[in-house]
Amino acid sequence: MPMTVVSGRFSTALLPTCFSLSRLHSVKYAAQRRVVFVSRSAHASSASVSVETNSNSNVDFVIEKKDKNRGEKKILACPICYNSLAWISQPNGLIESAASGIQVQCNTCKRSYSGNETHLDLAVASGSKRYSEPMPLSTELFRTPLVSFLYERGWRQNFIWGGFPGPEKEFEMAKAYLKPVLGGNIIDASCGSGMFSRLFTRSDLFSLVIALDYSENMLRQCYELLNKEENFPNKEKLVLVRADIARLPFLSGSVDAVHAGAALHCWPSPSSAVAEISRVLRPGGVFVATTFIYDGPFSFIPFLKNLRQEIMRYSGSHIFLNERELEDICKACGLVNFTRVRNGPFIMLSATKPS
């Protein structure tokens, strides 16, 4: 059996009782290409912004040494009461076989959570024998085995028709926003099959990468795709967690960065999700997301605005949000310095937690 992604490094990487940041030294990351793009505020024109790459240039990213006073830090929390978790079962200290032996318990409400072969399940309803909580269609679609299997086998590639420049270019663009928090931890929220989780892990720009999704089948695909890649670098820094985006199992102010690739339009409540992201981000932490927005006439024709609301209510999709609404959500949730890049329906946005 191949080594599980959720491996023995749980005891040194996530540590429900004590999260120890890696001792990082200054390194240079030489990117193979430089992404040139224009970042504008939402108050600027909504015209499309072109995204170019220059394969002849390099971008240097320097990871600064972390403050010694931040050497130990809690991160995992109970999704019910948001208090810290403690080990119940931690087989042999370092878990080298499967996550199924992991069991943690909330120090306050005493609710326990466990892991399976592929991931640690920290959803509120995890372990329920009879209760099943249905989600909106846009969420349930990605919980199906078929869509989870197809996501990196043709599904995601079709996003190019919506203006998405492709995972590699999107990763390069995101790094520019994430530069202030390099060397810290990052949550790849709604990670799907782990496309960006693997890119973040392989880059070695972060001390810990948490691949988080609500779909069990997506996390299984993430696990399988990772373990198919022989000698995948920095595997010990990647952890798979199942959780609800609107109920993140992390302590307040414990996370350096949150990335959400092509996900925001599928969240049942974008405002609830961004509020949670704002809660877990530390001061100065960065939120970066990409999504589709088909604003156009839906943003200014009254009849179509009402139709938009009905479509979103029944489908659970939020593709008809506009730029100003996305900025409003971020501001309402306590995030500042909203910027964005557009290319047709594609938008990459970034906002930060005030320092």
Curated annotation (Swiss-Prot):
GO terms for biological process: biosynthetic process; methylation. Gene3D superfamilies: Vaccinia Virus protein VP39 (3.40.50.150). Its main location: plastid. Residues 1-49 form a transit peptide. GO terms for molecular function: S-adenosylmethionine-dependent methyltransferase activity. InterPro entries: Methyltransf_11, SAM-dependent_MTases_sf. Pfam families: Methyltransf_11. It is found in: Plastid, Chloroplast, Plastoglobule. Keywords: Chloroplast, Methyltransferase, Plastid, Transferase, Transit peptide. Its EC number is 2.1.1.-. Coiled coil: none annotated. It comes from the Eukaryota. One of its GO terms (cellular component) is chloroplast. Belongs to the methyltransferase superfamily. PANTHER family: METHYLTRANSFERASE (PTHR43591), OS08G0411200 PROTEIN (PTHR43591:SF46). This is Uncharacterized methyltransferase At1g78140, chloroplastic. It comes from Arabidopsis thaliana.
